[in-house]
Amino acid sequence: MITHGFYARTRHKHKLKKTFIMLSAGLGLFFYVNQNSFANGENYFKLGSDSKLLTHNSYQNRLFYTLKTGETVADLSKSQDINLSTIWSLNKHLYSSESEMMKAAPGQQIILPLKKLPFEYSALPLLGSAPLVAAGGVAGHTNKLTKMSPDVTKSNMTDDKALNYAAQQAASLGSQLQSRSLNGDYAKDTALGIAGNQASSQLQAWLQHYGTAEVNLQSGNNFDGSSLDFLLPFYDSEKMLAFGQVGARYIDSRFTANLGAGQRFFLPENMLGYNVFIDQDFSGDNTRLGIGGEYWRDYFKSSVNGYFRMSGWHESYNKKDYDERPANGFDIRFNGYLPSYPALGAKLMYEQYYGDNVALFNSDKLQSNPGAATVGVNYTPIPLVTMGIDYRHGTGNENDLLYSMQFRYQFDKPWSQQIEPQYVNELRTLSGSRYDLVQRNNNIILEYKKQDILSLNIPHDINGTERSTQKIQLIVKSKYGLDRIVWDDSALRSQGGQIQHSGSQSAQDYQAILPAYVQGGSNVYKVTARAYDRNGNSSNNVLLTITVLSNGQVVDQVGVTDFTADKTSAKADGTEAITYTATVKKNGVAQANVPVSFNIVSGTAVLSANSANTNGSGKATVTLKSDKPGQVVVSAKTAEMTSALNANAVIFVDQTKASITEIKADKTTAVANGQDAITYTVKVMKGDKPVSNQEVTFTTTLGKLSNSTEKTDTNGYAKVTLTSTTPGKSLVSARVSDVAVDVKAPEVEFFTTLTIDDGNIEIVGTGVKGKLPTVWLQYGQVNLKASGGNGKYTWRSANPAIASVDASSGQVTLKEKGTTTISVISSDNQTATYTIATPNSLIVPNMSKRVTYNDAVNTCKNFGGKLPSSQNELENVFKAWGAANKYEYYKSSQTIISWVQQTAQDAKSGVASTYDLVKQNPLNNIKASESNAYATCVK
């Protein structure tokens, strides 16, 4: 059987888009049949009462028998020793049911199997010798065996000779049948059937010998989508078929071959089978093992297949920067047909594959452990044509729609049987599908893995004192070159720090601006970085830990970096304890077995110990108890620390009285503008329960409270706000009537509004203050001045490529023509900005080497600029910026003699003028053809 298939596939998300069914005429396949190639595949028949009927699944081995008067199907079954189920399997397409067949009347036809020739000779004919041929009949009607004439025994026998010989045998058979007891109609039908079968027996035998072929040709796109599959029987008996199957396909620009073998075991009503396949993707060098099982019945097929990779990771054939390997998986398939309407069929399949990035639908949509369910229907109006539609729905709401049309031409069947609807039923029976191809996924589903084409590593964490600038060491490996690094420094920015580019030419030159040290709080910040290359690929996320030390701490010092209590209050009963934990690190690394001393700074309480050693995690603990109500402050210190680190104050309370158990401020700094408020929250408890409607009295050393007294709510909380118009530090205290002792909140500080004075910009080269000049000297520097806030500033630039800024000093370096914003953040988290406007022009000295005048002109032209129009233009630059070597970039230059544009007279004379940006010294009549000056360009 040769099958031509044509398919159209559409992919869609949520909705199915319009699709078109591609139809095409099948390609004709012609065979030249050589007698020698299949002489040993002949069927030999003898008709006699001593032989038994054997079933066979090919039409040429079946007999169309006409019932005689008084004869029934049951009579034939008994007399010929044929199971009724066997007769029914051959006649399903002629009768609507088995009972209808049993009622067949005289004159109606019944298909019966022919009998095979037993071995009556010492050996079968040798290849190429004359085979013995007998006509067909039923048991009890013996025909004598006829030997082929010498003319047709030669190995070069032609098809015409074979056909003529078959006709002669048919004529001889006709005369013999007329003399038998069979009726005339039967003799006529038998003679005609045998004659026709003999005429095509050579071709049929060849096709049966070579099994089933299925071809799908796609003419477009260099035949992408085409395939060929071939099933070859090795051994074929009534109850068992052993076969091999080979296939090849060219799909998605990959050439894949399949080689398998299996067995099918036929029972009266069903078939059980197994198969093993090796799949080889020659384009991508992928190998896979497939193991499958089959269970078929009339009008029903099912199969299960497992797929197991035999090759590992290697560079992908068609997916750039990825490795690939076969994905392990399985599928379960069901196909069913309506016995009452066999032209209509249904399909159900589930498939599952395993891996992190599996391309079940396509290589552009990678999924983790994807699965998909497929439902489909097909329609076969005649055996020649089958049309179908499949819908597949999978993981991630992926959808797939497949329209198909197959043209199936069976060379072992007459043309009339391939275009008549009544023969469709035969295709759906177990006997009719005996040689069908194994139902499996012959395409190798692949799993992908991104290659390590870009990696980022930060080998060292950062430890530094507050508000310092620390260089970040980065190690980048990139296949396509580094484009940028994206940082998530939100935790650092929330406290006034940041990660910024240093302004150099390197894309990986970054620095960390450390925020102010938070007394009693966490001073460890987690920052992540991700690198991107020039092709848009990204690296893994890399974590950088930044530890901020107070000014009293020293880098490389073994010191307490965090000191906290497990709660803010406890009972003043001498029993309930508050536990303190001190964390000791050196350059951000926890230090074990370090002695830590503890002291009570204020208040009355008792420590469990005056010192303790750190454990393996760098932590030392101590407990605190008191039998007197009040606030207590405890400190911790290592031997290398010059000053101790205080923890936040805790409160011991009398449980029999309404007491303040907690007081806190929402921030520690604010602007002294009378509007920026700090909110204080006090909690009042008695025993273990909050006290409502309790009056709390507040006092402050600076600023204005929203109220001097507030009553607690149902949860025991009372709140007030504090504002100030005067800069300075403020201490707020709270008290309740039952306890005569004040409870103090953490100290806060008010600052004036942070501003940048854009009219007081200092030019580094001249010391002159004022507005920023509108003509820039590249790499010229200016100092910005901020005022207000807490006086501790962190500077940053929105675009360091235009103008970078020193994070601590506010010194700006001008680099390229453009605009950017400079920001300053004070430790009280105020922010002020200054926008640098695009200059009218940028003076760019090219310091690589001295060049001729014409080379200088070309250099500036390539740069997108031109030479200065005159010496006066450069003189104005000198007046605005001073000597160029006053700036860091030019500090090693003793002179920067620069060409200026020639006048008409200069051009005639071959001379030009120059101007020195370090020493001024304007010169004229300098020979233009010699390398006497630099190319300083105006952009």
Curated annotation (Swiss-Prot):
GO terms for biological process: cell adhesion. Homodimer. Interacts with Tir. Keywords: Cell adhesion, Cell outer membrane, Disulfide bond, Membrane, Repeat, Signal, Virulence. Residues 40-153 are annotated as: Sufficient for homodimerization. Residues 40-212 are annotated as: Required for periplasmic localization. The keyword Aminoacyl-tRNA synthetase does not apply. It comes from Escherichia coli O127:H6 (strain E2348/69 / EPEC). The record marks 889, 891, 896-899, 903, 905-907, 911-914, 919-920, 925-926, 929-930, 932-934, 936, 938 as: Implicated in intimin receptor Tir-binding. Its main location: membrane. Residues 40-153 are annotated as: Peptidoglycan-binding. The gene is eae. Residues 1-41 form the signal peptide. SMART domains: BID_1 (SM00634), BID_2 (SM00635), LysM (SM00257). PANTHER family: ATTACHING AND EFFACING PROTEIN HOMOLOG-RELATED, ATTACHING AND EFFACING PROTEIN HOMOLOG-RELATED-RELATED. Residues 63-112 form the LysM domain. NCBIfam families: intimin_all, intimin_alpha. Disulfide bonds join C860-C937. Belongs to the intimin/invasin family. Residues 189-430 are annotated as: Inverse autotransporter. Has a signal sequence, a periplasmic Lys M domain, an inverse autotransporter domain (residues 189-430) predicted to form an outer membrane-embedded 12-stranded beta-barrel, followed by an extracellular passenger domain (residues 450-939) with 4 Big domains (residues 450-550, 559-653, 658-751 and 755-842) and a C-type lectin domain (residues 842-939). Beta-barrel forms a hydrophilic pore for the translocation of the passenger domain to the bacterial cell surface. This is Intimin.
